[in-house]
Swiss-Prot record:
Keyword field contains Cytoplasm: yes
Name by which UniProt lists this protein: Profilin
Keyword tRNA-binding: no
Task performed by this protein: Binds to actin and affects the structure of the cytoskeleton. At high concentrations, profilin prevents the polymerization of actin, whereas it enhances it at low concentrations. By binding to PIP2, it inhibits the formation of IP3 and DG.
PANTHER family: PROFILIN, PROFILIN-1
Keywords of this entry: Actin-binding, Allergen, Cytoplasm, Cytoskeleton
Length: 131
């Protein structure tokens, strides 16, 4: 199965009538494995910041989580495993796997919990597969 299928069918899927705004699977080196059509272009320093926060949890809290130039306020996550960000009525969830970052971005009417469930479910599956 291609990485694009994971994005299209597992991240951009419908949940209770709602969809993520955009999603991607990114290598921890910043390489794009697959992304939705409207996923913002990640900058190298944004990927470095995300990877750095997984290695040393809490480093993004003072500065914010940046995805494609958009700043998200870092909210509670799972240190070393999940980073969650909020911006107005929307937000983002980043799940770290052994080799990748699974990223979902949402806006109303999707809830933070729905985004977390979609992103973390795929991330956990990839971890179980050794990825």
């Amino acid at each position: 199965m291609s990485w694009q299928v994971y994005v299209d069918e597992h991240l951009m899927c419908e949940i209770e009538g709602n969809h993520l705004t955009s999603a991607a699977i990114i290598g921890q080196d910043g390489s794009v494995w697959a992304q939705s059509q409207n996923f913002p272009q990640l900058k190298p320093e944004e990927v470095a910041g995300i990877v750095g926060d997984f290695a040393d949890p809490g480093t993004l809290a003072p500065t914010g989580l940046y995805i494609g130039g958009t700043k998200y306020m870092v909210i509670q996550g799972e240190p070393g495993a999940v980073i969650r960000g909020k911006k107005g009525p929307g937000g983002a969830t980043v799940k770290k796997t052994g080799m990748a970052l699974v990223i979902g971005i949402y806006d109303e009417p999707m809830t933070p919990g729905q985004c977390n469930m979609i992103v973390e479910r795929l991330g956990d599956y990839l971890i179980d597969q050794g990825l």
